[in-house]
């Protein structure tokens, strides 16, 4: 019934629905294609849906030199792009037909065989190689990509065909190790790959990513876990791989290398169990104040408390820990540090200043509750909050009595200059004089291209003319 509908009606149906699959129910499919304005690529749709019979019909049309195949529907670019896409998916029959109708097996810099290798489609790889694909292109990139993803059968096949697994300075074993492909690593070693290339990059990557069995194997083969100033334990600690850290310590890694970098990085990234273990093994968390600052910066309250319990003196770091916690919005850390006696008013209330600049209104409220003067320096806090566009902070200060007109209406001028339209509107609603200093607010907004603010200020009575 459906294929009896006239082509003109099908054009309207497909245009309206956007369902390109409807074309395939009509015998006038190829005549319709030229009439329908659909963004979907016809070949791409057929390939994505594995419509092999339709593709076979395309081959027939190609042999008949049909104008659609030679012209607007199939182009070399679309064939090559869809060849690569199907090498990714592993649709070997589609791949064969795409090659039959003119796809370039070495197009896009031999991307077809590279993609098939990368995704582990061994039968596709074999077929492409059989058809003449240059599997050694880009300095044997195909075998390196297969190693990276752990496709052992692909690697073995490519090696059997002559690929050099040692290309690019033994990069294959580094990638395989970094991704935890133990059997691949063992195979590569059996083929003579140098596990110590690039200053033991393989074991460093495996440690960094927590692949314990790979690390153990590499150590058994002579890799140096202490290369690059004990890079392995520093990265394992920073990434929270506790069992890896324990193993590396058992193999004599230096946990205090680079001024206790391992425990500092674990503190920054929130790995409490790693920190506890490193401390039990002799890491010095009191030699400098970086650990407490790093933990405070990222809001790791449990680590901050643990470090204090282990003797870290929060006053040794000046007020840096509470300042950075305030800047990054970590209220609980701020409260805890204040409860432990840190001087949060140091450096002219910098802790407070950082919170208001970043818009952390709850921290601002807390610090005001702790005695910080929010009207200091002729209402500098509300002026700075306006300058930074922190509407919530501005509203809080105004609710507490801050003067929005301080310093000749600095707040509305600076918020206009920076493009903070909601702050501008709030300040105007609360009595700011938009015409202060010869309409400075609208002039600044105009100079900086904030057209919506200019329009708003003019609507509220500001004057913008040639003179100003």
Curated annotation (Swiss-Prot):
Transmembrane segments: none annotated. InterPro entries: Ankyrin_rpt (IPR002110), Ankyrin_rpt-contain_sf (IPR036770). Pfam families: Ank_2. Keywords: ANK repeat, Repeat. It comes from the Viruses. The keyword RNA-binding does not apply. Coiled coil: none annotated. It comes from Acanthamoeba polyphaga mimivirus. ANK repeats lie at residues 38-68, 78-107, 109-137, 138-167, 169-197, 198-227, 229-257, 258-287, 289-316, 317-346, 348-376, 378-406, 407-436, 438-466. This is Putative ankyrin repeat protein R873. The keyword Repeat applies. SUPFAM superfamilies: Ankyrin repeat.
């Amino acid at each position: 019934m459906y294929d009896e509908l006239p082509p003109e009606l099908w054009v309207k149906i497909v245009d309206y629905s956007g369902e390109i699959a409807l074309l395939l129910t009509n015998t006038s499919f190829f005549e319709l294609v030229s009439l329908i304005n659909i963004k979907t690529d016809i070949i791409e749709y057929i390939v994505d849906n594995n419509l092999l019979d339709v593709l076979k019909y395309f081959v027939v049309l190609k042999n008949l030199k049909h104008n659609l195949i030679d012209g607007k529907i199939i182009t070399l670019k679309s064939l090559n792009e869809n060849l690569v896409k199907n090498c990714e998916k592993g649709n070997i029959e589609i791949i064969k037909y795409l090659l039959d109708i003119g796809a370039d097996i070495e197009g896009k810099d031999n991307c077809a065989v590279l993609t098939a290798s990368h995704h582990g489609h061994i039968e596709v790889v074999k077929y492409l190689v059989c058809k003449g694909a240059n599997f050694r292109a880009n300095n044997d990139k195909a075998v390196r990509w297969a190693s990276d993803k752990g496709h052992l059968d692909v690697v073995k096949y490519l090696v059997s065909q002559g690929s050099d697994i040692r290309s690019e300075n033994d990069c294959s074993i580094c990638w395989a190790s970094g991704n935890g492909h133990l059997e691949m690593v063992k195979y590569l070693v059996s083929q003579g790959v140098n596990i110590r290339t690039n200053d033991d990059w393989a074991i460093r990557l495996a440690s960094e990513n927590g692949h314990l069995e790979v690390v153990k194997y590499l150590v058994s083969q002579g890799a140096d876990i202490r290369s690059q100033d004990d890079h392995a334990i520093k990265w394992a600690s920073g990434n929270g791989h506790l069992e890896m850290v324990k193993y590396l310590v058992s193999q004599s890694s230096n946990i205090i290398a680079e001024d206790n970098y391992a425990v500092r990085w674990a503190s920054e990234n929130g790995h409490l169990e790693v920190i506890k273990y490193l401390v039990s093994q002799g890491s010095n968390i009191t030699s400098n104040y970086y650990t407490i600052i790093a933990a405070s910066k990222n809001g790791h309250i449990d680590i901050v408390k643990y470090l204090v319990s282990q003797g870290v003196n929060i006053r040794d770091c000046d007020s840096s820990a509470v300042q950075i916690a305030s800047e990054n919005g970590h209220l609980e850390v701020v409260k805890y540090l204040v409860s432990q006696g840190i001087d949060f008013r140091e450096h002219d209330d910098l802790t407070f200043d950082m919170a208001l600049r970043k818009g952390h209104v709850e921290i601002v409220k807390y610090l005001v509750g702790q005695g910080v003067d929010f009207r200091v320096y002729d209402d500098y806090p509300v002026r700075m909050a306006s300058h930074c566009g922190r509407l919530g902070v501005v509203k809080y200060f105004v609710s507490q009595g801050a003067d929005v007109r301080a310093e000749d209406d600095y707040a509305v001028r600076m918020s206009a200059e920076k493009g903070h339209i909601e702050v501008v509107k709030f300040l105007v609603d609360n009595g700011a004089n938009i015409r202060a200093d010869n309409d400075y607010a609208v002039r600044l907004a105009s100079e900086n291209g904030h057209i919506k603010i200019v329009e708003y200020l003019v609507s509220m009575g500001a004057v913008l003319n040639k003179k100003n």
